[in-house]
Every structure is written in structure tokens, then in C-alpha cells.
């Protein structure tokens, strides 16, 4: 039998969650707003080639099964900019008799140049259990930041807001990895 030790933080505190969700996973811009960014090269592709790939992907995002009212809000082929206004569901858990999900709204902006893609996810806002006493509407800064969505020791996800942080990071990772893979082909 092999015994493996639980992963720990530098302070020696045992981790209760995957490190990808812990301290520093949610980034803030200079204005203190939650903002996720990705920059990638595109295997030598021109700005026009990258634009077409990204436009097709971002158009497809608006047709996703969890889509509520997402749309491509801005296209500028000359400047190589595409912006989506996203409105979709993040499903936390689902069974035959229950569904736990939140509506998330955000902007997804792609800035493209030759051999380069910069993607930004910003202005995140949640609408949870609308019309119920346990429901709320709030910006990501009050829901998924380190101070709010992590335990005091920062070694796990907080009970209430941890699921929002995990769901948001998973969605961001999915979009960023899929689009990076497409432009690098």
C-alpha cells in the first residue's frame, strides 16, 4: 500500500480543493474588476484567418445549449475585433427532481493581429434563483474573488460562493482552451 500525502499550501495548510480554483485563480484588472485574459500565438496565421476562426467560434457560443440571450454584439473586420455579450446558464448540479444553476452575463472580447489573439472575459454578473428568498443578483467582484469565495485559510472553496467560482473558472477554461486550440491548428 502506498501512502500519499495531501497537497499543501506553502504555509503547510492542507488543500481541500483543486489548486486551480484557489488563491490567484480569479484576476482583477486595474479598476478592481474581475477580468480573465488569454494571449496566444496562432501558428503564423494572418489576422484575417484568425478573425474568421474566432468569429465562427464566438458565433457558435451564442447557440450553446445553456444559452439564454447571448449575441455577437460587435464585429469590426478592419480592426479585427469581435465582442460577444454573453447570457447563459452555469449548471452546478442537476438531478431528476432538482436543478441548481445561475444565470451569468459577461462580455467576451477578441482583439486579433497577425499571429496573435488576445481574448478577454469581463463584466461578469450573476442572477441566482431569481424570485426566491435565497436568490441574489450581483457582480463577480462580490461573488467569486479570493476574499469571498475561498475559506479563511484559502485552502478550499467557501460553502455558498465556491460553486460560483468553480463554475466560472471551468467555463472560462473551456472557452479559452477551445479557442486557443482552434487558432493554433
Question: Which stretches of residues belong to each language-model region?
Answer:
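Ser/Thr-rich, low-complexity intrinsically disordered terminal regions
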Residues: 2-185
Amino acid at each position: 500500500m502506498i501512502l500519499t500525502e495531501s497537497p499543501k499550501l506553502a504555509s503547510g495548510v492542507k488543500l481541500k480543493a483543486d489548486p486551480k480554483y484557489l488563491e490567484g485563480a480569479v484576476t482583477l484588472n486595474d479598476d478592481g474588476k474581475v477580468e480573465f485574459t488569454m494571449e496566444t500565438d496562432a501558428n503564423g496565421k494572418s489576422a484575417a484567418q484568425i478573425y474568421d476562426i474566432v468569429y465562427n467560434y464566438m458565433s457558435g457560443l451564442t447557440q450553446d445549449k445553456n444559452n439564454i440571450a447571448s449575441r455577437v454584439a460587435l464585429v469590426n473586420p478592419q480592426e479585427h475585433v469581435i465582442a460577444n455579450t454573453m447570457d447563459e446558464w452555469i449548471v452546478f448540479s442537476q438531478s431528476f427532481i432538482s436543478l441548481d444553476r445561475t444565470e451569468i452575463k459577461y462580455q467576451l472580447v477578441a482583439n486579433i493581429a497577425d499571429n496573435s489573439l488576445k481574448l478577454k472575459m469581463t463584466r461578469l454578473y450573476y442572477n441566482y434563483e431569481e424570485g426566491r428568498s435565497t436568490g441574489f443578483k450581483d457582480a463577480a467582484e462580490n461573488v467569486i474573488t479570493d476574499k469571498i469565495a475561498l475559506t479563511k485559510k484559502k485552502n478550499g472553496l467557501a460553502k455558498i460562493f465556491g460553486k460560483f467560482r468553480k463554475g466560472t473558472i471551468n467555463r472560462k477554461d473551456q472557452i479559452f482552451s477551445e479557442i486557443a486550440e482552434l487558432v493554433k491548428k
